[in-house]
A protein has these predicted regions:
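Jelly-roll (double-stranded beta-helix
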Residues: 1-284
Length: 284
């Protein structure tokens, strides 16, 4: 079990330089999994300006975006506003992304049900630098000056081809569009656990993903039993402790599969929790 305090971390370099955006795009790397695993994941905080552009595209993995501030464009006239959460399923098209407001976003990327995993930021940067010797990245597209063969390709697809030696395989999409959720529209429901209330925001069983908000009353405790799932917590209000670690606004917690932990608050605490089960063996 680990804790990081995103609000206190400095902004790092852009992890999506292949999409452009310059130095105005920045990221904070919170937690990540194991490269080449079908369960590989990356949790980051992202800062994007309203000038950021990404063409219509899709991924062979899954993504969740929690808009903390501003507004995220995900298609023409479609936005994820502050406090809203969007799920981008594997193989589902979205975009173009342009306009909206400057925003700060909590972003989780993780291997989809197809078991292909995803390429982590370090390997992606290495590939991008290697590919820059033979072409250029512009507006989310990799362009090559070649006599024969395909000249232009989606930036991420081009990197995937460079790293893995083949283009990504897209499973039949389970959803036509990304799913945008409005947590504030849901009532808090009293849990069977004393002093705990929840909002069950979204459950996506084909990938074992659940998105839930928790509210812990002053003086309350919450136990995370040992489980096969990965649990990622993001504190949205209040203060508390998980084991010996202090929690505050924008603290993030990783409870790994098999770990048990207890969270306690004296003054009250709210957090958003992403729970992800391992990719099923028959899928991987």
């Amino acid at each position: 079990m680990e804790v990081v305090h995103a609000g206190e971390m400095p902004w790092g370099e852009s992890l999506v330089a292949q999409r452009g955006g310059g130095t105005a795009v920045a990221h904070k790397r919170l937690f990540e999994g194991t490269e080449d695993s079908p369960d590989h994941y990356l949790l980051v905080m992202a800062r994007e300006p309203n000038t950021y552009f990404s063409p219509r595209h899709r991924h062979p993995w899954d993504q969740v975006r929690f808009c903390l501030e501003g507004s995220i464009p995900i298609a023409k006239g479609v936005f994820v506003d502050g406090g809203e959460i969007a799920y981008f399923p594997e193989s589902t098209h979205y975009g173009p992304q342009e306009g909206g407001e400057d925003r700060i976003v909590l972003l989780l990327q993780f291997g989809g049900a197809s078991g292909q995993g995803f390429i982590g930021p370090d390997r992606m940067k290495q590939a991008r630098l290697e590919m820059a010797k033979h072409g250029r990245f512009e507006d989310g597209v990799y362009k090559q000056d070649v006599v024969e063969g395909r000249r232009n390709r989606d930036a991420y697809e081009a990197i995937w081809l460079h790293v893995k030696g083949d283009v990504p395989t897209y499973a039949a999409p389970v959803y036509k569009t990304p799913v945008v959720m409005l947590p504030a529209a849901l009532p808090w429901k009293v849990s069977h656990e004393a002093n705990v209330s929840t909002r069950e925001i979204g459950v996506f069983p084909h990938r074992g993903l659940s998105i839930t908000s928790y509210r812990l009353a002053p003086g309350g405790s919450h136990v995370f039993p040992a489980d096969t799932a990965l649990r990622l917590l993001f504190v949205t209000a209040g203060t508390g402790h998980i084991e010996k670690h202090a929690l505050g606004h924008w603290s993030s917690v990783r409870v790994n599969p098999g770990e048990l932990a207890t969270l306690h608050t004296d003054s009250g605490l709210e957090w958003m929790q992403l729970t992800v089960l391992p990719v099923a063996p028959e899928q991987a």
